[in-house]
């Protein structure tokens, strides 16, 4: 992580620096162990194909975690992630790049907290959105230092 980001330095319309991941089949097996999601579509190619899929697919919750990392990397240690939502629009495949992106929609003060609302999404290598959602972050303000 670089320097701490402050509320005053954020503008509506700003892009969040993208987070690029390349999940592997091994990572999917490890994720299954950690999450308890042992659905074979995430590690068994033949099983996935028998269910009409082109092959093994990445867990949706792993994509969700990438979106969470996008936000926590961006807001820094003094920021706090207040809300994170995600809905799945497509599939990601192991070995392919997943790019998490975001854009600031608005910033406001509520209950004394400096909040930033963002649209967030994940893209496959074709630039198609495979997941999208929103996040609200509580940011430190220079005026409160």
Placement of each model-derived feature along the sequence:
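HotDog/MaoC-like acyl-thioester-processing domains
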Residues: 1-16, 94-145
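Hot-dog-fold acyl-thioester-processing enzymes
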Residues: 2-80, 144-145
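Mid-chain, well-packed structural core segment of small domains
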Residues: 73-100
């Amino acid at each position: 992580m670089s320097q701490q980001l402050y509320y005053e330095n954020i503008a509506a319309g700003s892009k969040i620096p993208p987070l690029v991941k390349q999940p592997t089949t091994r990572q999917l097996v490890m994720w299954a162990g950690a999450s308890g999601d042992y659905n074979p579509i995430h590690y068994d190619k033949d099983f996935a194909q028998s269910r009409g899929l082109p092959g093994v697919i990445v867990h949706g919750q792993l994509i969700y975690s990438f979106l969470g990392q996008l936000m926590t990397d961006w807001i820094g240690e003094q920021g706090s992630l207040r809300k994170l939502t995600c809905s799945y629009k497509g599939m990601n495949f192991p070995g392919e790049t997943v790019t998490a992106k975001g854009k600031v929609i608005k910033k406001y003060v509520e209950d004394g907290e400096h909040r930033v609302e963002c649209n967030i999404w994940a893209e496959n290598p074709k630039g198609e959105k495979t997941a999208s959602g929103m996040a609200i972050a509580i940011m430190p303000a220079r005026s409160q230092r």
